């Protein structure tokens, strides 16, 4: 039931709000370095030393609360297990990456190859867990249903890897990723309620609760960042939720911000290589472009709050449009 999910969300939010300050104190007590700041963005100088890995708190709390709730309310289904597994495993990848950077002072963290291999393995296991409860290999595009058979396994891997990294790129300024993802997940919560998929709804609402609790400390000026442990987990979670709700295509609208952020990086890199050093944007991902003045020529651009609000509203509007189209077909 919806009420069960709301209760789980509130509990997750409260525990996260209680847990984050203690996590911040741990970082300060151990004198651990925070997330590296961007030298080209002068506004970020004040962020030096800010603790990271805050995603560890809301991820763990969301996982524990949703698991207990699923067992208590009888929602421990293959769909729930799949969503839970993906969220947890992508968090593990992010945690290892953050751990190497923060605790072992290895700036690169996990190598790109290590991350990719881990994400592919998680995608393969996710496919088998998903297939245990869902026998069809159908991708839903508006009113069309395309059966891609064995290639569905490849689709799941690409979908998970793509969206996890897209959300990771979006997590670049205070509060941006946490609320943008919360808005995206709210759209999927609506779909889950309408289709009475309360097993998936339970974990969706738990994660939203965790994000709201985290935002209390992550808004400008942020006292803590979520790190890869949070952003990679959220991206993978969004991807698998869209699959479990048979609404894969909607993520292209609901997650348009993540798509734009990713495309800005890809275009910048390609153009830079082709022109021998020229740039399309002042800096990517594109939220930094707006911070640095955008195409206006000004030395200082939008504030972090302005970027946040514009991106949140953009996500909210496109989410409503996606839902309208989804239910129309």
Swiss-Prot record:
Its EC number is 2.7.8.13. It catalyses: UDP-N-acetyl-alpha-D-muramoyl-L-alanyl-gamma-D-glutamyl-L-lysyl-D-alanyl-D-alanine + di-trans,octa-cis-undecaprenyl phosphate = Mur2Ac(oyl-L-Ala-gamma-D-Glu-L-Lys-D-Ala-D-Ala)-di-trans,octa-cis-undecaprenyl diphosphate + UMP. Its cofactor is Mg(2+). GO terms for molecular function: metal ion binding; phospho-N-acetylmuramoyl-pentapeptide-transferase activity. Pathway: Cell wall biogenesis; peptidoglycan biosynthesis. GO terms for cellular component: plasma membrane. The chain crosses the membrane at residues 1-21, 53-73, 76-96, 109-129, 141-161, 175-195, 198-218, 237-257, 309-329. It is an enzyme of class 2 (transferase). Keywords: Cell cycle, Cell division, Cell membrane, Cell shape, Cell wall biogenesis/degradation, Magnesium, Membrane, Metal-binding, Peptidoglycan synthesis, Transferase, Transmembrane, Transmembrane helix. Its main location: membrane. It comes from Lactococcus lactis subsp. cremoris (strain SK11). InterPro entries: Glycosyl_transferase_4, PNAcMuramoyl-5peptid_Trfase, PNAcMuramoyl-5peptid_Trfase_CS. This is Phospho-N-acetylmuramoyl-pentapeptide-transferase. It is a multi-pass membrane protein. Belongs to the glycosyltransferase 4 family. MraY subfamily. Catalyzes the initial step of the lipid cycle reactions in the biosynthesis of the cell wall peptidoglycan: transfers peptidoglycan precursor phospho-MurNAc-pentapeptide from UDP-MurNAc-pentapeptide onto the lipid carrier undecaprenyl phosphate, yielding undecaprenyl-pyrophosphoryl-MurNAc-pentapeptide, known as lipid I. GO terms for biological process: cell division; cell wall organization; peptidoglycan biosynthetic process; regulation of cell shape. It is found in: Cell membrane.
């Amino acid at each position: 039931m919806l009420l069960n999910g709301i209760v789980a969300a509130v509990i997750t939010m409260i525990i996260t709000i209680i847990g984050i300050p203690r996590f911040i104190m741990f970082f300060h007590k151990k004198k651990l370095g925070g997330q590296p700041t961007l030298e080209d963005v002068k506004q970020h100088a004040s962020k030096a030393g800010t603790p990271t890995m805050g995603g560890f708190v809301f991820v763990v709390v969301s996982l524990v609360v949703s698991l207990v709730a699923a067992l208590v309310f009888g929602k421990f289904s293959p769909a729930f297990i799949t969503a839970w597994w993906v969220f947890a495993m992508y968090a593990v990848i992010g945690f290892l990456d953050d751990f190497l950077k923060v605790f072992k002072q290895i700036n690169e963290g996990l190598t790109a190859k290590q991350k990719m291999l881990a994400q592919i393995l998680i995608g393969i296991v996710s496919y088998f867990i998903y297939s245990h409860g869902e026998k069809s290999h159908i991708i839903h595009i508006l009113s069309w249903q395309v059966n891609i058979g064995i290639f569905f396994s490849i689709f799941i891997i690409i979908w998970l890897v793509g969206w996890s990294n897209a959300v990771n790129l979006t997590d670049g300024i205070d509060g941006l990723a946490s609320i943008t993802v919360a808005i995206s997940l709210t759209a999927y919560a609506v779909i889950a309620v309408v289709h009475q998929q309360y097993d998936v709804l339970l974990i969706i609402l738990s994660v939203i609760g965790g994000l709201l609790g985290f935002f209390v400390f992550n808004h400008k000026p942020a006292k803590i960042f979520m790190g890869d442990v949070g952003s990679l987990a959220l991206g993978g979670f969004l991807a698998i939720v869209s699959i479990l709700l048979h609404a894969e295509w909607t993520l292209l609208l609901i997650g348009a911000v993540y798509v734009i952020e990713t495309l800005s990086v890809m275009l910048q890199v390609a153009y830079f290589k082709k022109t021998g050093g020229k740039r399309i944007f002042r800096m990517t991902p594109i939220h930094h472009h707006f911070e640095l003045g955008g195409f206006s020529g000004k030395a200082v651009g939008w504030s972090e709050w302005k970027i946040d609000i514009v991106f949140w509203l953009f996500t909210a509007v496109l989410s409503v449009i996606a839902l309208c189209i989804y239910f129309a077909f």
